[in-house]
Amino acid sequence: MSAASKSIDVMLKPLLVGGRPISNRFVMAPLTRCRADDNHVPTAAMVKHYSDRASMGLIITEATQIQKGYSTFAHEGGIYDKEHVDGWRKVTDAVHDKGGIIFCQIHNGGRSTVPSNVDEGVRIVAPSAVAITGHKCAGSFARNGKTQPYPVPHAMAAEEIASYVNLYAAAARNAIAAGFDGVEVHGANGYLIDQFLKTSSNQRTDEYGGSIENRCRFLFEVLDAVIQAIGRERVGLRISPLNSFNDQSDEDPQALTRYICSQLNLRTIAFLDVMRGDFFSPARGADKWAREEYEGVLFTGMSFEIEEAAKAVESGAADAVVFGTKALANPDLVARAVAGAPLNKPDPATFYTTGEAGYNDYPFM
């Protein structure tokens, strides 16, 4: 055994996730890559991409759209009709054939959606009529390739909120039909659920706004509906209490984190995935708040080096660590970690382009 493998030995231990053992503590982060076809059906390139990374203890897919005609990203995957189910089945079969485990991240963008990606007659929605103003939609995410401002979204009525809860549950059922081992509910990074959670984007005065309990109401209605649809052992949740991406902030992120964790303790889901900090600042600590409060399986991530991840797992600060760009650029990340081999460097210029370049051409050792 190499010195490198000894230092990360704890990362190679199996872990029970929802009653199912995963082979190691390396988790592939949900990474938007925009490689699905025009109808949001997974492509052959996606089959290869995910199956090449089957040695990760758990794969979590890219954010996968739950609603027809509401595309947050051009060429994102969808999970709202049979065509998507059939397409994802090819991915899950390929991952399972290599002994891997894969969850589908189910997602809606809310106000963080490119206007030109939304079908005629479909409204861009959010908890409140508050637009993103800190940046514009990147052309790489748009069907028409044009950079454009975010519009003021439509503030959802109570009956619309209920309809979105149903969309998440339907997407979860479709994911299981497609062969996924479970789903991760996307409650992070300024998308629809996170917009309800944070004070910067939720200015409601009804039962879905104001107090932490009210701002979390939509999250737990979604989570409970998904649990009812597919079983708690197949459900994970991702949150990003400190991340300012998409104009997000909260008046008391620690209290928000602790409340979410206290409520999750009553539900015994498969895992909680907490992004520890902010994309744009050194702020860190959300994982520590979660570990102090949450009694279940805890994943954390955001710019971890491999030995740092091993120390986090060894100390009990996390049960597994989520890797983004390292998994993106290294299909054999686990083997490289064991060997102490150098890692491929990711190419940001190809993160959101279509085709194989920067997607399936990163070499194995």
Swiss-Prot record:
Lineage of source species: Eukaryota, Discoba, Euglenozoa, Kinetoplastea, Metakinetoplastina
Annotated PANTHER family: NADH OXIDOREDUCTASE-RELATED, NADPH DEHYDROGENASE 2-RELATED
Enzyme category, top tier: oxidoreductase
Residues reported to bind FMN: P30, L31, T32, A63, Q105, R238, S303, G324, T325
GO cellular component terms listed in the entry, alphabetical order: cytosol
Subunit structure: Monomer.
Location(s), subcellular: Cytoplasm, Cytosol
Protein's name in the database: Probable flavin mononucleotide-dependent alkene reductase
Keyword Oxidoreductase: yes
Cofactors required: FMN
Outcome of gene disruption: Knockout parasites show reduced replication within macrophages, but are resistant to bicyclic nitro-drugs including delamanid and DNDI-VL-2098. Sensitivity to bicyclic nitro-drugs is fully restored on expression of this reductase.
One Gene Ontology term of the molecular function aspect: oxidoreductase activity, acting on the CH-CH group of donors, NAD or NADP as acceptor
EC number: 1.3.1.-, 1.7.1.-
Pfam families, per the entry: Oxidored_FMN (PF00724)
Active-site feature positions: Y191 (proton donor)
Keyword terms: Cytoplasm, Flavoprotein, FMN, NAD, NADP, Oxidoreductase
Top-level taxonomic group: Eukaryota
Similarity remark: Belongs to the NADH:flavin oxidoreductase/NADH oxidase family.
UniProt keyword Oxidoreductase present: yes
Function statement: May function as a flavin mononucleotide (FMN)-dependent alkene reductase on substrates carrying alpha,beta-unsaturated carbonyl groups (ketones, aldehydes, carboxylic acids, esters, lactones or cyclic imides). The catalysis depends on NAD(P)H, which acts as a hydride donor for the reduction. Seems to be involved in metabolic pathways required for efficient replication of amastigotes within macrophages. Acts as a FMN-dependent nitroreductase that activates anti-leishmanial bicyclic nitroaromatic prodrugs including delamanid, DNDI-VL-2098 and (R)-PA-824, forming toxic products that kill the parasites.
